[in-house]
Amino acid sequence: MAKLYFNYATMNAGKTTMLLQASYNYRERGMTTMLFVAGHYRKGDSGLISSRIGLETEAEMFRDGDDLFARVAEHHDHTTVHCVFVDEAQFLEEEQVWQLARIADRLNIPVMCYGLRTDFQGKLFSGSRALLAIADDLREVRTICRCGRKATMVVRLGADGKVARQGEQVAIGKDVYVSLCRRHWEEEMGRAAPDDFIGFMKS
């Protein structure tokens, strides 16, 4: 039976690079993959999945209200789909996560989702919450904090280099997010007193 996978991490852990490599592995063997990326903050109908190291490929965009099961099923009727990949899966709606589960359960197509677990305030995204609840396989993609510990949280830096402690859940631009361990995230967010001098400028 096919499975629904959720590969989650903080920013700059290499999630997108892993997605592109996995899709390439299928295509290298003559198999067809279907790629999706969040279109919530993009214009037009053409999506692009790109990694920090320069890899990129075209992808279909998904937005709120889209029926992903119907889109994959229609494509599968004409061309066999061997695997579905979803980048920025944190932006999925709960119902769309269930649609992806149906792709695995009813069409027997593996679905590989990649995304963030929490936002800069330590709160779950809607798509991540649903994936953590129903995905068959959860995989943490690891990166490190400035102190060398495993990074599990992110902070957002404003244009002035100061840590943002409030605001909209999403700000466009990967350069404004920094991955930290829980300890240093609490310090930067003002939840705990800092005991080192390697932090960012406080707001």
Swiss-Prot record:
**Record localization:** Cytoplasm
Q: Which UniProt keywords apply?
A: ATP-binding, Cytoplasm, DNA synthesis, Kinase, Metal-binding, Nucleotide-binding, Transferase, Zinc
Which Gene3D superfamilies does UniProt cross-reference here?
3.30.60.20, P-loop containing nucleotide triphosphate hydrolases
Using the UniProt record, name the top-level EC class of this enzyme in a single word. Answer: transferase
Kindly state which reaction or reactions the protein catalyses: thymidine + ATP = dTMP + ADP + H(+)
Give the main localization category.
cytoplasm
Q: How does it assemble?
A: Homotetramer.
Under which name does UniProt file this protein? Answer: Thymidine kinase
